[in-house]
Amino acid sequence: MDPDAQTRAAIEEHWRASERGDTEAEHAVYADDAILDYPQSGERFRGRDAISAQRGGHPASRHFTVLRITGTGSLWVSECVITYDGVPTYSVSIMEFAYGHVVHESQYFADPFGAPSWRAALAEPMPGRSIASA
């Protein structure tokens, strides 16, 4: 298997493990000294153990739907919908790899929002979706 296929497979398993609640398998993709940044809150988590502990301690029921994984070499991006207690949040995860493991990840979160009326004539619904009202 070529290196990009191996990395994609590792990311896919990361998200499958996240969905099934297997925190050990979910975090196997991270280097021991990996860094996870949440730029919107200003938080940084150092090391696989800290990353795993903060995710494992989340109080909400979570479900993960992967929309897209793209990348090559050391830089990969996942777009997901993470549903917390039934409420969807869109997430973009930017992962930097070295020696087969994530060494740095930045994860961004965005709640759905209503589309403003001024651009209604310019937009069409995304596949499988309807346009939310403001």
Predicted regions mapped to residue ranges:
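Short, low-complexity N-terminal intrinsically disordered segments enriched in polar/charged residues
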Residues: 1-32, 122-134
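A beta-strand edge to alpha-helix "cap/lid" segment located at domain peripheries
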Residues: 1-3, 52-134
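A solvent-exposed, acidic/Ser-Thr-rich amphipathic alpha-helical stretch
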Residues: 5, 20-74
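A general marker of short, structured functional hotspots
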Residues: 10, 26, 34, 41, ...
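Aromatic side chains
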Residues: 14, 30, 38, 45, ...
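Alpha-helix C-capping/helix-to-loop hinge sites
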Residues: 14-17, 36-37, 79, 83
